[in-house]
Design a protein with these regions (language model features):
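Terminal amphipathic alpha-helical/low-complexity segments used for targeting or macromolecular assembly
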Residues: 1-82
Length: 82
């Protein structure tokens, strides 16, 4: 699945490459290339610059800190994730 396809399902806004391939979901601290993770709690912001995830699901109020991964913005990343 691509970020584009996932963003359409979640009604989210894409930041980055819409063709980024996603093959799994993982917690941000354990994610690897091909995974998507989410940031729904401020305490996980520290992982944003360290994660190996290919994409992150973030809130509409969050400003992405990286340009090498894709992001999907939604109103509630946690609800979108589950």
């Amino acid at each position: 699945m691509t970020i584009q396809e996932l963003a359409e399902l979640l009604h989210g806004e894409i930041i980055g490459d819409p063709q980024t391939d996603i093959r799994g979901i993982e917690k941000i601290e354990y994610a690897e290339a091909g995974h998507i993770a989410f940031i729904a709690n401020q305490k996980y912001l520290r992982y944003e610059t360290q994660t190996l995830a290919s994409a992150l699901l973030i809130s509409t109020s969050h400003t992405p800190q990286r340009t090498d991964i894709a992001y999907i913005r939604t109103e509630d990343p946690y609800d979108s994730f589950v």
